[in-house]
Amino acid sequence: MHKNNLPKYFLFVDKYEKNILKNDITNLGIIYRNYSKKQNESDIYRLRSYCNKKKFKFYISNNLKLAVKFKTDGIYIPSFNKRITFNKVNLNKNFKIIGSAHNQIEIKKKLDQGCEAIFLSPLFKIAKNRKYLGVCKFKLLTLKYEKKFIALGGIRKKNINTLGMLNIYGMAGITYLKKNRPKNLGRFL
């Protein structure tokens, strides 16, 4: 197994696809989150194998039992999960807890849940949500805490270079990372 440092790039997927990426990104974490239907364990197994082969980190969203069963690199706690707290004594020492937040209250909750990195979103305007943080609010929120923040939401080619102005550890996406090569990702990291 590879070193268990947090990746700089994260990709959200809801199912296994043979060619998840059309590029050669390294330092990538894949987060399996499927909220629309029952968790497909064969998809999880294939994603775990794919990540091992490509030396990517693999995380499961919101299901500690599956994360332990499939020996993932960690768990992703979505912003709507306000109650889970973990006892890391029972987990592998390299097991990472990461989570997402949309505001200061949710950031504090993720800190209480023991998250090592927090996905702060949406940074830019996205189709499904009229509210977004914008560069100024995002930067103010991240400067308050000594934590690794990952930008998420609305990241596109036209605004990728804006990430260089932010206090971030990395970036995450659902579609942008699938299509763009690392050289097109800007110099923000």
Predicted regions located by residue number:
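Internal catalytic-core helix/loop-beta-alpha segment
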Residues: N94-A127
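Conserved, mostly hydrophobic/aromatic
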Residues: I30, A67, K110, I118, ...
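N-terminal amphipathic alpha-helix/helix-capping segment at the start of soluble metabolic enzymes
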Residues: M1-N19, L189
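N-terminal active-site wall of soluble small-molecule enzyme domains
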Residues: K18-N19, G29-N90
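Hydrophobic faces of well-ordered beta-strands that scaffold small-molecule active sites
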Residues: P7-V13, L28-Y32, F58-I60, I75-I77, ...
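Alpha-helix-loop-beta-strand connector modules within alpha/beta enzyme cores
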Residues: D43-Y59, K82, N87-N103, K131-R156, ...
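Glycine-rich phosphate-binding active-site loops on the catalytic face of alpha/beta enzymes
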Residues: I75-F86, A117-Y132, I155-L189
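Short, acidic/polar
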Residues: L11-D24, N62-K65, H102-K109, R156-T162
